[in-house]
Structures are given as structure tokens and as C-alpha cells.
Amino acid sequence: MSILFRALNWLMFVDPAWTKERLIPILVFEHPASEPAWNGFLHGDVPSAPLAEIIKPLLLDLIPWIEIFSWERAISEVVSQWLGEMRVFHPDKPSGLSQSEMRAVLRSMRDDTRNSFINWLGFVGQENEHNWLNYVIPLIDECWPRERQYRTSASMRAWIGLLDDSGDSFPVVYEVVKKFLVSVEINDHVFYRFTEEISDEKPITARFPDETLDLINRVTPQVLSHLPYEVLALIEETEPRLTSDARYLRLIDLVERS
């Protein structure tokens, strides 16, 4: 069964009528063979547009269902990326997702799956310099859940990881991401790339000191055990005027009191 459904895209191309009549019903969650069928299918290729259109109602509810089983976590990540591609590349089409559908999918994910999805968005952005503006920013701005319960220390690390991958697009990506950031205790190691030269490019902090200062201030709580000393030092070196900024003064006060 798993081997058969791994070829579902090809079967849909070769004989769509037979595939819709004989195979698609097996994917309904109540079918006794649905578990091995989905397991095989999810180890295959991204569903084609005609197939995605047919099984879309099942895909929308798939993540909570597969998390009932003891499959490897990567399976949930595969589904989340398929759904992300349906929203990013086929928005509001029969084979794609609407804003509300994508938002509901994101809410249905476990925290670790949602954070892996953030990492995937970073990969999408890095594939082409225009992808940040054309695909990544719209999905985050239009679809990401606003509720406080989705802003965890793990999600902060994921968002910061996405930001330090955004290169020249850092200011515009940060502008949309910052609404999902809250002050939580996180290891200062997540900021190491903000002070390091990557591929002979100046560090993010040296290129965008104002946005970096705002980021550090936004995610730093009043009491913490790890402080981003190197980032603050580079901000002072790159843009001395910011040393009189209220955000900088607050962070320096935390440094001096620690």
C-alpha cells in the first residue's frame, strides 16, 4: 500500500479517473488502510496541482491526524512545507490555500513543527533575493497567528534564525516579523551571526545597527542571565549616535546591573 501511494502523483497523471475512484477514497482518515497509504504518499513528491485540488480538504486536517501516530517528526514538517508551497505559489487557487486556511493550518501545528516551518521560510527566501518580498513577507504578514500563545522561546530562536538569513532584506523582513517577537529568556548564542562576517559580508549589526538594536531591545526581558555584549559593542562602534537611544541605554543598564 505504501509503495503504491508513493506513486500517487504519477498514477493521477496516467489515469486520473481510476485514481480518483479507486485510490483517493483510501486517504480518507476513517479508511482502515489510510495510515499506510498516507505514510507512502508523504514519502513521495509534492502533490501536483490537480491532485492537490482533490485532496486539499484532507491536507488541511492532516497534521493533527498524523501526529496521533508514532511517525518521525519530519513527516509533519513535510506536510507543513507542502501546505506552505500551496499558499506561497498557488494563493487562493483551487489547488492552493487562502489566508484563513493557512492560518488555521499554522494554529494546528505543534510548536516544533511551526518553528521548523519558519526555518523553511528562511530557505525559500534564500533561494532568490526577490523571494523575501514576493513570498515570505506576504505569508508571514497575512497568515501568521497573532495570539500570544504562539510566541515561545523556541519560536523566538526560529524567528531570529530567519532574520539572520535574510541578508540585504533584513530591514523589510524584520518590519513584518517584529510583531511576533516578545521578550523571553533566550541564549545569546542565537545572535552570534549578528557580529560575524559571513561570505565576506559585513555583520548584520554593522549593516543595520538601528534595526538590530530594536530587535535586541524587543526580545530582551528586564531580568536575564545572558546578555548580547558583542552586539551592543558593535552597535556602538558602527553607529555611535545610537548610544544615546533609550533602547540602547536600557540594555546597557541591564549589562551594568548583571
Give the location of each predicted region.
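Non-catalytic all-alpha helical scaffold/repeat segments
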Residues: M1-S258
